[in-house]
UniProtKB/Swiss-Prot annotation:
Keyword Secreted: yes
Upper taxonomic lineage: Eukaryota, Metazoa, Ecdysozoa, Arthropoda, Chelicerata
Entry note about domains: The presence of a 'disulfide through disulfide knot' structurally defines this protein as a knottin.
Pfam annotation, one family: Cys_Knot_tox
Protein name per its UniProtKB record: U1-cyrtautoxin-As1c
Subcellular location as annotated: Secreted
Tissue spec. comment: Expressed by the venom gland.
UniProt keyword annotations, A-Z: Disulfide bond, Ion channel impairing toxin, Knottin, Neurotoxin, Secreted, Toxin
Cystine residue pairs: C23-C37, C30-C51, C36-C66, C69-C76
Amino acid sequence: EIPQNLGSGIPHDKIKLPNGQWCKTPGDLCSSSSECCKAKHSNSVTYASFCSRQWSGQQALFINQCRTCNVESSMC
């Protein structure tokens, strides 16, 4: 199985969410995009951060994980 590129190498801002928890980094399990950390310089349209459905070969089911990607690349 080829591992998914979830954007863990893209710098992101680790901030506290309104619910008091820290935002989730690329690869963390999530239930909505608002939980995911945004890429640094997210005021530009270069990067997108969202909660995405991914196949987990280890668990043999779909899971939701935070993902950050460059919107101009094919990885998004």
